[in-house]
Amino acid sequence: MFNYVLKKVLGTKNERELKRLRPLVARVAELEPRMKALRDEDFPRLVAEWKQQVREKGRTLDDVMPEAFALVREAGVRALGMRHFDVQLIGGAVLHSGKIAEMKTGEGKTLVATLPCVLNALSGRGVHVVTVNDYLARRDAEWMGRLYRFCGLSTGVIVHGLTDRERQQAYGSDITYGQNNEFGFDYLRDNMKFRLQDYVQGELNFAIVDEVDSILIDEARTPLIISGPSDESSELYARVNAVIPSMIRDQDFTVDEKSRTIVMTDAGVEKMEKKLSVQNLYAPEEIETLHHVEQALRAHHIYRNEVDYVVKEGEVLIVDEFTGRLMPGRRWSDGLHQAVEAKEGVKIEAENQTLATISFQNYFRMYSKLAGMTGTADTEAEEFAKTYNIDVVVIPTNQKNVRKDAEDVVYKTEGEKFDALCTEIEQRHGTGQPVLVGTVSVAKSEVVSALLKRRGVPHSVLNAKHHQREAEIVAQAGRKGAVTISTNMAGRGTDIILGGNAEMMAKHEVGPEPDAPMEGEEEQAFLERKADWAKRLEQALEKLKAQTAAEHEEVVKLGGLHIVGTERHESRRIDNQLRGRAGRQGDPGSSIFYLSLEDELMRIFGSDRIQGLMGRMGMKDGEQIEHPWLTKAIEGAQKKVEAHNFDIRKNLLEYDDVMNQQRRSIYRLRRMVLGFGAGVPVVEYEEDPKTRKKTRHEQVFTWADAGEHMLDLVEDLVVEMVGASCPSRVADWDLEGLSANIREQFGVEMKFTPPVGRPQEARRALEEQVFNVVEKLYRAKEEELGKDPEGIPVLRRWEQYLYLQAIDQQWKDHLLSMDHLRQGIGLRGYGQKDPKQEYKKEGYEMFVQMTWRVKSAVIGNLLRLQLVRQETAEELEAKRLAMQRKALQRITASHAESAGDGDAKPAPKQETVVRQHPKVGRNDPCPCGSGKKYKKCHGATEAAV
C-alpha cells in the first residue's frame, strides 16, 4: 500500500527518469535554429572542435550532449531526410547514460543510435554498435554511415569473412557496426595471436547492443568457443548409434524434456552393456562410452530434425531456436553434434578441443559502458539489473499504439488448431488484409504452408530453409493481400510498412547495384553504367512511392497488419516481439494466438492446471475456448519457463566467472609478453572491487623488462621448490630431494649442508644461494648467445617465443581439464558439498599448478637452449608468424551448448594512467618507502601470474 501511495505521489522510476530528460529535449529544441543556419561544411568542423575539447581540454561528453544532439538532428534531416522525434532524443540520452531503451517496433531505433554514437565518438576511443546478423550490420552501417560521414566521422563494419587487415580498418573507425558473434570471436582470436600489431579489436569502450534482449539474454545460454581438432576417434559414435534404436522409452530410459536430459534405467544400462560388450558402463575406464551413449540418446529422443537442426548437403546445421535461422559453422559441444551426425547418417566430423571460450555475459561486461535498445526488454528488467547492472527505461511512443490484441484461442488438438487458424487466414486474405503468421519451428511453418496451399491461398515462407530473401519478404509483408509465414522473429530489424516498402521494391525491380567493372569494361563505361542504375532506381522509386502510398491507405481501411501466432513461445518477450510487428507508428493492426493442449509449452510446462481449467469449462472436440483465466494460466506457464531459463543463464555465469578470472589473468600475461620490445602501449584495466570503477593503465614494455621478468620467474620457482622441500620443522627437510629437483629444473648440480640457526632464516639463505647460482647461469646464457644486429640480446627473442609456446600449450590443456572438472562436479552434491564452491576451489588449484608448469617450462627450456646456428630476428619473427598461421587455420569458431553463471556489472567511467617513472628493478628499494626490496614489497603483489 505504501509503495502504491509513493508511486502516486512521486511517479514510477521510469516516469522520474523521463521527467529528468525533458529539459535536454527543450535545450536541443532551443539550439535547432542555430544548427539550421550552419553550412554543410560546418558540421565536420564543429565535430573536430568538440573532439579536441573532449580529448585535450577536459570537456565532458555530458557538457557537449545538447549541442551534439542538436547537430545530429539537423544532420539527419540533411543526410537522410529524417528528423529525430523528441522521444528519440530521450532514447539517445538513455543509451548515452549506459541504460537500455525499450522502444516499440517502428519507433526508429536505428536512427536513435546515431545520437549517442556521434557523441561518444568524440572521445576517440571507439563506439561499437552490435547487431543480430550480418545483413543488419551492413545495412545500418551503410544507411547511418551517410549521417556519420556528413559529420566527418568514419564508419566500419565487422561481418563474417573479413581479413585481419579489413577488421583492423573497421575497428579503427570512429563507429563500428558488427554482428555479435564476430565481436566476441575477434576478442578470442586476438588473444591467440603472436604480435600485438596483429590484434584487430582495440579498446572495448562503449557498446550499443541492438535487439539487446536477443543477444544478452536469449544467446547468453551458449558460450562462444574457439576449438581445434582433437585426437578423438569418431568410430565409437557410429558403434553406439547402431544400438540406440533397440532402447525403449520409459522402459530403458526416461526423458525430461524440461531440462533436455535423459536418464537410463537399470534395465537400460544392462541392455547397453550387453549390446556393446561392456562389463560395467560406470567403471572409470568406460566413462567415455557412457558419455557417448547418453549423447546418442539425447540426439535420438530430444533433438529433432527440422526443429533443432536441418540436414543440408550432407551437413547437420543448427537452427537458432529464437530466430529460426540456420547457423552454419556452429556446432554443439561435448560430442552432441557428432551423435546427431551419426543419427542422420552423414559424415561424422572429428570432435574438437576447446582452445578459447567466453560467455556473452563476460564479454560484454568488459566494455567501459554498455547500453542497449529493443522493443521488448521490460519483462526481463530484473535479469538485466542483476546480471549487467543496467536499468531498462521504457520510452513512450511517438504516436499512440492502436493495435487490438485478442485473447488466446485454445483447442484440444493441434490438428483442430491448424484448421481454425488457416480458416481465419483464408478469410482475412479474402478481404485483402495482410497477414503475418508466426511459427516456432521450420517444421511447423511447413505444416501451415502445406495447409494453405491446399486451400489455394498464395503466401511466402520465411524459415531457415528459405532465408535468402529474408529482408525483402518481411519488408513486403504489409502489402495488400500478402500472407507471410515466418519462424519466430526471422526478419527482425526490418520494418513491415503497410502498403509495402517502396525502396526495397525499387531495388528488386531495378536489380543489384553494379559494384565492379565487368571483364574488359573500361572504368568510364562502368561509372556510366552505375550512374544509369542510380537514375533507373530513382525513377522506379518515384513511381512505387505513389503506388505504395495509395496501397497504404487501402490497407489501413482494412485494419492494418493482422498477426496470427500459431503457438506460445516459452518466453512472453518473444510473443510480444511478434505482436509488435503490427501497429507501428500509430498504424492500425491486430493480433491473436491460436493454441492447443498438444503445444510444447502446454505439454511440458502447462501442468495439470490448464487441463483442469479446460475440463471445468466443458471443452468438447473441435470447440474453441477463449477466457482471461486461460490466458493468465498460460502466462504463468511462460513465467515458469523464463525463471527456469534465467537459472540456466545464471548458472552458466557463475561457472564462467571462475574461468573469467583465469582467462583475464592469462590474457594479461600474454599481452605483456607480446609487449616486450614491441614499442606499442599495452592497455590494461584495474577495477576497484567496491566501487566497480575502472582505472585505465597504459604501459610500454622494453626488452630489459623481459630480462627482469625472467628473473622474477626464476625467483618464484626457487621459492616454491625450497618451500616444498624445507617445511617449518628442520627435521623434515629433504635436501637431497631439493638437489634432485634443482638438477631437473635448472640443469645444475648443488649440494646443501644441514641448516644452522632458525628455520625461516636458513630457508631464506637457501633461496638466495640457489637464486644466485641460477642467475649466474642465466647471465652466462645471455653472454653465450650474444646480440643480434639491432643490439638486442638474442636470448630476449627466444624468451618471448618460448614463453608464448608454453602459455598457449598449458592454457589449452588447462581448458580441457576444466571441462572435465565441470562435467563431473555435479556429483559432489551427493557428498553434501556445494558443486560451485568445489569448482571454484579446485579450478583455482588447477590454475596455480598450470601457471607453475608455464614458469617451469619457460625457464627450463631457456637454460638448456643450444643454438646450432644464430637465428636472425627476422627468422624468429617468421617462425612466430608461422606458428600463428598454423594455430588460426586449425580453429573453429562456434556456439556450444553449455551450462552456466551470476552477478555481473558493467564498469563505470575509466581513468587513464600512463606510467611516468621508470620500471623499478627487482632488488631496488620499493618506491613506497617501506625500506624493503621492491620484490619483497609491492613487487610481490604486482608480479604476473
Curated annotation (Swiss-Prot):
Ligand binding (ATP): Q88, G106, E107, G108, K109, T110, D495
Keywords: ATP-binding, Cell inner membrane, Cell membrane, Cytoplasm, Membrane, Metal-binding, Nucleotide-binding, Protein transport, Translocase, Translocation, Transport, Zinc
Membrane topology: Peripheral membrane protein
Bias-annotated ranges (Basic and acidic residues): 902-914
Catalytic activity field: ATP + H2O + cellular proteinSide 1 = ADP + phosphate + cellular proteinSide 2
GO molecular function: ATP binding; metal ion binding; protein-exporting ATPase activity
Subcellular location as annotated: Cell inner membrane; Cytoplasm
Annotated spans, Disordered: 892-945
Biological processes per GO annotation: intracellular protein transmembrane transport; protein import; protein targeting; protein transport by the Sec complex
InterPro entries: Helicase_ATP-bd, Helicase_C-like, P-loop_NTPase, SEC_C_motif, SecA, SecA_CS, SecA_DEAD, SecA_motor_DEAD
Any one GO CC term of the record: cell envelope Sec protein transport complex
UniProt remark on cofactor binding: May bind 1 zinc ion per subunit.
Cofactor (UniProt): Zn(2+)
EC number: 7.4.2.8
Repeat is among the record's keywords: no
List of residues binding Zn(2+): C926, C928, C937, H938
Pfam families named in the record: P-loop_SecA, SEC-C, SecA_DEAD, SecA_PP_bind, SecA_SW
Functional description taken from the UniProt entry: Part of the Sec protein translocase complex. Interacts with the SecYEG preprotein conducting channel. Has a central role in coupling the hydrolysis of ATP to the transfer of proteins into and across the cell membrane, serving as an ATP-driven molecular motor driving the stepwise translocation of polypeptide chains across the membrane.
HAMAP family membership: SecA
Subunit structure: Monomer and homodimer. Part of the essential Sec protein translocation apparatus which comprises SecA, SecYEG and auxiliary proteins SecDF-YajC and YidC.
Family to which this protein belongs: Belongs to the SecA family.
The name this protein goes by in its record: Protein translocase subunit SecA
Taxonomic placement: Bacteria, Pseudomonadati, Myxococcota, Myxococcia, Myxococcales
